[in-house]
């Protein structure tokens, strides 16, 4: 039985669910879950939690992501990416803008921004996914969402051809960010229709492309009984949270029994959630949170016996 976090390289054409389904067959275990959906046409890092590590999948999702995308100015689509039907075209020429204009524009997207999610997305409105409305040719008001663009920059020259302009960007962002919406919004600010023509996730949950294995590689390693060495411990998925190392055996016992604590029993300031780590084994003991009605107390959220 495997336990840990496995960074998978999801190839284009597969859904995130396909990856989980195939892994369950390869590894012969049902206790597998991914950490955030990647669209079928997007390749890149998809961390998968196996065994006990499924309990930390939410925390892996919260750790942020990085992408490399191609923005295509001059044509918009129904899906905001290359898979959709054309909505609008407007010829783009090298006299319309230059790379300095693009760089200044990209700077304006840094920080907390508002996005309207694409109609072809899994965001739910009134209990129904937006893509379900879109497939039925129904329109529905989409809620604006705040997302965090930690960094964004151009990583290629501008390529003007066939009345369009293409360039690559790298984006570091928080969860819930739609890069294809970012591409269309870049076009709006330039005064042109636009879409995202290619996307690769280069980092997710602290895992990068070089950490990631294809399904074929995973199958081979499993057959050679050497896959466990490639799994990251579940503690890795909690590195985005503050932690305290516990040496005292009495306190360890209280934590594992799920007892409440007063904040002032610890030297560290506890603002929201805290991970207790066994000071001897370096294994996670529990995740605690501030008590919702008693600010001076912390209570267990997840205990790892």
Swiss-Prot record:
Disulfide cysteine pairs (residue numbers): none
Residues at the active site: 39 (nucleophile)
Top EC class for this record: isomerase
Keywords: Isomerase, tRNA processing
EC assignment: 5.4.99.25
Family stated for the protein in its record: Belongs to the pseudouridine synthase TruB family. Type 1 subfamily.
Name of the protein described by the UniProt record: tRNA pseudouridine synthase B
């Amino acid at each position: 039985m495997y336990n840990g976090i496995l960074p998978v390289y999801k190839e284009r054409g597969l859904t995130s669910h396909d990856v989980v389904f195939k892994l369950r067959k390869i590894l012969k275990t049902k206790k597998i879950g991914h950490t955030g959906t990647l669209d079928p046409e997007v390749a890149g890092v998809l961390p998968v939690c196996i065994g006990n590590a499924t309990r930390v999948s939410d925390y892996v999702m919260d750790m942020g992501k990085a992408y490399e995308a191609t923005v295509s100015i001059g044509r918009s689509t129904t899906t905001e990416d290359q898979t959709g039907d054309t909505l609008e075209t407007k010829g783009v020429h090298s006299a319309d803008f230059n790379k300095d204009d693009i760089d200044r524009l990209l700077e304006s997207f840094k920080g907390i921004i508002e996005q309207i999610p694409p109609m072809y997305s899994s965001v739910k409105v009134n209990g129904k996914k937006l893509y379900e409305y879109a497939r039925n040719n129904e329109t529905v008001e989409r809620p604006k969402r705040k997302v965090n663009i930690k960094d964004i920059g151009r990583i290629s020259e501008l390529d003007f051809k066939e009345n369009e302009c293409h360039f690559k960007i790298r984006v570091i962002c928080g969860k819930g960010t739609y890069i294809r919406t970012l591409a269309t919004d870049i076009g709006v600010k330039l005064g042109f229709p636009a879409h995202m023509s290619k996307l690769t996730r280069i980092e997710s949950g602290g895992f990068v492309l070089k950490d990631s294995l294809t399904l074929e590689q995973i199958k081979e390693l499993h057959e050679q009984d050497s896959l466990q060495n490639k799994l990251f411990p579940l503690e890795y998925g909690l590195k985005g949270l503050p932690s305290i190392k516990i040496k005292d055996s009495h306190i360890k016992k209280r934590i594992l029994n799920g007892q409440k604590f007063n904040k002032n029993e610890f030297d560290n300031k506890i603002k929201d959630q805290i991970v207790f780590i066994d000071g001897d084994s370096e294994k996670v003991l529990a995740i605690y949170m501030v008590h919702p009605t008693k600010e001076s107390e912390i209570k267990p959220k997840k205990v790892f016996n």
